[in-house]
Amino acid sequence: MGKVVMYSSVSVDGFVADENDQPGPLFDWLVSGDVPLDESGGLKVSQTSYDYTRPYWDQIGATIVGRHVFDITDGWDGKPPSGIDHVVVVTHRPAPEGWDPEAPFHFVDGIEAAVAKAQELAGDRLVEVGAGDVGGQVLAAGLIDEVRMDVVPVVFGSGKRYFGSVHAPQHLLEDPDVVIQGNRVLHLRYPVRR
């Protein structure tokens, strides 16, 4: 089984979106360089960001998101983002009316079921958990192995927190084993202390 990694771009003060679910400049680093990050050529980053991000993306076998993220992205029109093979959606509701049953999206109830399904789908590859409320719940349940943050130099002041609104016991992370500076971003990777 692959590692379970919590990830998002995040403001310096710990937010993944503002109060209106807008990311503001959190993804500007994805268009601030000259090295294409994906086949579309729309994402261009610095060489250091490419060397960190592309291998990570290539290792992801499944991503877990909450129904809220699924809804505000319109389910990415049935195509998982960044070339990911499968998306597991944590929800108490069924798939949307008219949703293509062949789309590689899996709707499950509860975080434990979501992690189990994602690990089954990913095999030995990574399971990525989107930061926010679902990510915070998975961390609180002790199911996260690593925390990755792409810290962007902006202060939101309020909004949607990286670790969500979950009131969980304190979790100690190890010292970062990766610290990489890109254009408009600082990439950090923390193993979760067990």
Model-derived features: positions:
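Enzymes that bind and transform nitrogen-containing heteroaromatic metabolites
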Residues: M1-R194
